[in-house]
Each structure stands twice: as C-alpha cells, then as structure tokens.
Regions:
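Aromatic-capped interface at the extracytoplasmic side
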Residues: 18-37
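Short extracytoplasmic
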Residues: 31-32, 36-74
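Short, conserved loop/turn and helix-capping segments at secondary-structure boundaries
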Residues: 51-54, 125, 129, 205
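Amphipathic, coiled-coil-like alpha-helical scaffolding segments used for oligomerization/assembly
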Residues: 91-114, 118, 123, 127, ...
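Long, charge-rich amphipathic alpha-helical coiled-coil "stalk/tentacle" segments
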Residues: 192-214
Length: 214
C-alpha cells in the first residue's frame, strides 16, 4: 500500500510546489504592483520580481503608471463619435460664461498619469469622468474670472496653467491618485451664432490700433 501511495504523494508535492511558485510575479518598469489579500489592499510594490501568497489568498493588479492618458472636454474626436472626419462639439461642456459676461465656446484636453496606484484603484469609480468633472469645474472657475479678449488671445497659456493647478487640487481632495501633466486648449471661440460679428469687432479694433500707431 505504501508503494502505491508514493506516486500520489509525489504528484501532490509537485502540485504544491507549482502552486507556491505561482506567487512569483514581475512588475514592469512602467507599472506599480498593488497586492490584494481577499480583495483588500495589502501593499504597493515597485518594478522588479516579487512574491505574494498564491490564489485564492492574494492577487496582484499592475496598472500602467507612466502611460499618459487623455480626456477631451467640450468635444469628441471623430473616432469617438463614429464620424469619418472632424470633431463632434459638446455644447453642454464647451459653453462657458466669461468675467465680462460674454459666452466662450472652449474645447480642451487634459493629460494625466497615475501617481498612486492604490488610491487610483480604490478611491474613484470612473477616472475619465472624474478628471472631466474636476477639470470642467476648474475651467469654469478660471473663465469666469477672465475677460473674453484675454481668453481668446494672449491669456490662454496662463489660463491653462491655472486650470491644471485647480484640477490637481480637486483630484487630490478626492484622493484620486491621479497627476495632471498638462491642460491644452484645442479651440476657444465665441459661440458659432455670433462668431462672425465678433470677428468683425476684432478687425475693427485692430484697425483702430493701427491708426493710432501710424
């Protein structure tokens, strides 16, 4: 009986070894490892070879933390709208009130990375919607403090920096684990129905400036 049991014991030993070795895992240079024990956070590991208790006790999530993600606000690229070309405008996101009570139609993109994988995975449900909502709040706040002339001309870069800073503050308050790397204005115009009249006013103003300088 003892002879017949040896293959079984040997087979079980091999299975245990294979199971134990399944706990080895590698975190790539562009990742962070988030170790979960029965679904609860244990610790975060950095790039390299690591070990965790095998399934069903622990598992590891490895989100890409150096990948630059992009969220578009006020518009959707053709690839997202099913159109063959151009962009689809989203007025409910893009139309904003300026400090001098004009309306501006502004499209912009927010670029972001994961700075804390544990917070990113556990504190927010939808990263895209979270970034969009935070940046829209920030943009509306900043636009409301600026005159339309400033928004459409030399003030853009300063506005982008301020929006990035406020968006980051909001995301940090959420404990989102997200780092905003850039806010980039894609387009800023008066609404379509008044754009021609606005451009006429701008041209007249430029003519007056030229006349003064001559």
């Amino acid at each position: 009986a003892s002879v017949g049991g040896k293959p079984i014991i040997f087979g079980l030993t091999i299975l245990v070894i294979v199971w134990a070795l399944s706990g080895l895992y590698r975190v790539l240079p562009d990742e962070q490892g988030v170790v979960l024990r029965f679904g609860k956070y244990v610790n975060t590991t950095q790039p390299g070879l690591h070990y965790h208790f095998p399934t069903p006790f622990e598992r590891v999530l490895t989100p890409k933390v150096t990948k630059v993600n992009r969220v578009d606000v006020g518009f959707r690229p053709a690839s997202d709208t099913g159109r063959s070309s151009g962009v689809g405008n989203v007025p409910e996101e893009s139309l904003m009130l300026t400090g001098d009570e004009n309306i501006v139609d502004i499209n912009y993109s927010v670029f972001w990375v994961i700075k804390d994988a544990q917070k990113f995975l556990f504190n927010i449900q939808s990263p895209i919607e979270t970034v969009k909502a935070a940046s829209e709040t920030a943009m509306r706040e900043v636009i409301a403090k600026n005159r339309i002339q400033n928004i459409l001309t030399e003030g853009r870069s300063k506005i982008e920096i301020e929006v990035q800073e406020i968006t980051q503050i909001i995301l940090d308050e959420y404990g989102s684990g997200i780092q905003v790397t850039q806010v980039q204005t894609q387009q800023a115009d008066p609404p379509e129905q008044v754009i021609d009249a606005f451009r006429d006013v701008q041209a007249a103003r430029a003519d007056r400036e030229r006349s003064k300088n001559e």
